[in-house]
Amino acid sequence: MTAPAKKPSAQEGLFWKTKTLEQMSGPEWESLCDGCARCCLEKLEDEDSGKIYFTHVSCRLLDAGLCGCKDYANRSDQVPDCVRLDPANVRTLNWLPPSCAYKLVAEGRDLYWWHPLISGDPNTVHEAGVSVRGRVQGTELDVNDEHLEQHIVQWPGLLPKRARLKKRPA
């Protein structure tokens, strides 16, 4: 007779609470992405102050409806300045949105209720108003660099009120 399979504890499933970013497996790392696609928006940096300004213009590879990359595996080949997040740079990049799970975990904070790892539903990031769905006004192919300033918006650097709630609204 074989011993029954050990049932994992609830805590074992919460790998982001027990592992550092460096200790995560590839699939764990990838699952930390909430799918908001805010990092796929074009950004401007003030050369004097270093302040980052988000725009509502996306990378040409972003599928703005799905909030995902059209060619994730080859994104760096197609868009050479696409930043691949890693444990080192998530601690230093000043343009990650306040909702970014990589940033939250690096700071020792927990994920929000709408994160798919918490909710079990990839649509809660949209429900909470965190994703770029319905807010992108074109891609980098549609807007010349010299006109990007006309597309600066505040919302990507902010966390919507309903997203800050402790639990999913009824």
Swiss-Prot record:
InterPro entries: Puta_zinc/iron-chelating_dom, UCP006173. Pfam families: CxxCxxCC (PF03692). Belongs to the UPF0260 family. PANTHER family: UPF0260 PROTEIN YCGN. This is UPF0260 protein RPC_1790.
